[in-house]
Structure formats: structure tokens, C-alpha cells
């Protein structure tokens, strides 16, 4: 419906093949050859481990920070009177760096600081920040139900706090607070259907299991944090439909609040196809657009 009622950009491509530099293009307005962010460099590799239950994670996560000398899109908008929210993946700096959402023009944030962490849908923690609440910095929100069970292997399926749904709920709560006459911009940087192929065992997934009744399996990789799955095509298709439902929720909320005629909605992506986590871009015909 969004495509039918709007304008389609059929020759538009993401700014880079991978997420952090692609997002840097959007945030800085620079070509990928000019922005400082050239890849998905991970800062957790140098950080000390931290325990969440029996699970080991990293004490600092994130990517190369945007330069504080270069003003970025949320800062421009906030400086011009917009309320700003970002819900999903940041990938524009690491925890404690000069470039976290609280320091770069974002009023409300909930999601992942790190693009690598954002590959996992039942994580140990998410990050949050609220200027309205008086928060001083981005902090971690431990997902207490998830950390009762292992990140990988037997028992993982008992984790119940699905990050994509949690992030969408926060985004909708924020959107519901916005009012006509007060400009706002929301960066809803959802991660579906990227990387890990997993979601709640609900009617949406079960429906696709019936469609892809002879499905492709993926057995995982040694040392990988991605769990094996026996329904790669059904998982991927259902994750796309789940994202589609999120978009529908946003459009209905804008209409409900009388904001749809004065709100510009842009749907785009930050990276091209990949085979990570068992994804099958050949089957689904993705070409990076």
C-alpha cells in the first residue's frame, strides 16, 4: 500500500554494501568515499567480557564514531525545532564514545548501539536513552527473561524477549506522544529480516511453514552465535511480513492522530543481500535495491 500510494525509487541503492558506512552516508550526507566510516569495525574486540547470567557478552560494543566536528542529520533537525527519536540500530559509534545517540541530536533512543549486536533477536541487553526522562547517557537494559537461558544451543528457544517487537513497541509509544503543530522525525531503524533467522513461534511463522513445507535447512557454523534453523525460507518470509505489519502500524497511527497528510514517510534499507545466518538471497532474488 505504501508503494501504491507513494513514489517508488526503482534505481535507489543503499549507500554501502554493509550497514555502518551506509548509515554514515545517510547521517552525514557524504558519499561513502568521503565519510570516515569505511566498514563495520567492531570495538567489542578490545573490551573486557561481562556476564549476564551464565552468558558472556562484551563490556563495550559499537562501531567507529561519527566525528564531533561533522554535524549529522538528527542534529540539524533538532537544531531546527524537531523532536527526534531513533528506534532500532544506531551503528554510529561505540558505548561511551563521542558519538552515541544522546550526544548526536537524538531525544529518545531504544535499540542497539552496535550493528553486530543487532544481528541477534533474543539478545542479553538493549540500549536506551530518554532526554525527557532526564537520562544523562545511553545505558543498557538487561533483558532479564532472556538471560535465564543460553545465547546458543539447547535452551535458547526458551528466550521470550524478541528485540524487534520490543523496539517496535517503544517506537509506537513514542509516535503516539507526537502532536500536530510540533515537528518530529523518527528514525525507525528496524533490523528485520537481517542476519539471524528467528522469531516467535506464532501464526505468522506457522503460515509460512505451510507454504514452504519443503524448506531449506541451515546447520549453523562453528563458533557462530547464530543458531541452526530448519525453516530458513519460512523464517525469512515471515520476518519480512512482520516488518510489513510494523509499517502498517506506523501508517495507521499517523492516520489515527491526524498526521498522515503532513508527514513524509521514507522506507529504505542500509545494506545489500547476504548469506549470513542461513539467508538465501538467490532464492528471494534480492539485488541490493
What is the predicted role of each segment?
Residues 76, 80, 87-89, 246-248:
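Conserved beta-strand->loop/alpha-helix structural units within folded catalytic cores of enzymes
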Residues 1-72, 76-82, 96, 104-108, ...:
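Active-site segment of extracytoplasmic enzymes that catalyze sulfate/phosphate-ester chemistry
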Residues 1, 10, 40-42, 90-92, ...:
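Active-site-proximal cap/lid insertion segments
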Residues 15, 88, 112:
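Conserved residues at the C-terminal ends of beta-strands
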Residues 83-85, 186:
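Conserved beta-strand elements of the Class I
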Amino acid at each position: 500500500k505504501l508503494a501504491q500510494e507513494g513514489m517508488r525509487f526503482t534505481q535507489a541503492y543503499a549507500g554501502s554494501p554493509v550497514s555502518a558506512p551506509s548509515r554514515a552516508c545517510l547521517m552525514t550526507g557524504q558519499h561513502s568515499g568521503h565519510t570516515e566510516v569505511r566498514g563495520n569495525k567492531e570495538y567489542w574486540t578490545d573490551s573486557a567480557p561481562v556476564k549476564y547470567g551464565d552468558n558472556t557478552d562484551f563490556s563495550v560494543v559499537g562501531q567507529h564514531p561519527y566525528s564531533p566536528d561533522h554535524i549529522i542529520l538528527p542534529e540539524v533537525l533538532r537544531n531546527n525545532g524537531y523532536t527526534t527519536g531513533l528506534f532500532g540500530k544506531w551503528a554510529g559509534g561505540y558505548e561511551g564514545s563521542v558519538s552515541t545517540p544522546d550526544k548526536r541530536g537524538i531525544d529518545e533512543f531504544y535499540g542497539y548501539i552496535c550493528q553486530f549486536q543487532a544481528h541477534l533477536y533474543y539478545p542479553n541487553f538493549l540500549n536506551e536513552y530518554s532526554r525527557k526522562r532526564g537520562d544523562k547517557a545511553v545505558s543498557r537494559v538487561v533483558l532479564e527473561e532472556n538471560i535465564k537461558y543460553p545465547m546458543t544451543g539447547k535452551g535458547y528457544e526458551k528466550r521470550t524477549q524478541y528485540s524487534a517487537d520490543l523496539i517496535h513497541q517503544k517506537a509506537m509509544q513514542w509516535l503516539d506522544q507526537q502532536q500536530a503543530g510540533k515537528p518530529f522525525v523518527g528514525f525507525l531503524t528496524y533490523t528485520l529480516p537481517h542476519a539471524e533467522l528467528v522469531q516467535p513461534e506464532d501464526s505468522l511463522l506457522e503460515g509460512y511453514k505451510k507454504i514452504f513445507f519443503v524448506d531449506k535447512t541451515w546447520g549453523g557454523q562453528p563458533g557462530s552465535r547464530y543458531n541452526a534453523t530448519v525453516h530458513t525460507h519460512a523464517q525469512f518470509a515471515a520476518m519480512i511480513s512482520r516488518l510489513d505489519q510494523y509499517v502498517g502500524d506506523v501508517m495507521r497511527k499517523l492516520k489515527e492522530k491526524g498526521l498522515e497528510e503532513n508527514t513524509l514517510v521514507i522506507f529504505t534499507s542500509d545494506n545489500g543481500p547476504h548469506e549470513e545466518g542461513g539467508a538465501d538471497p538467490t532464492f528471494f532474488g534480492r539485488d541490493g535495491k
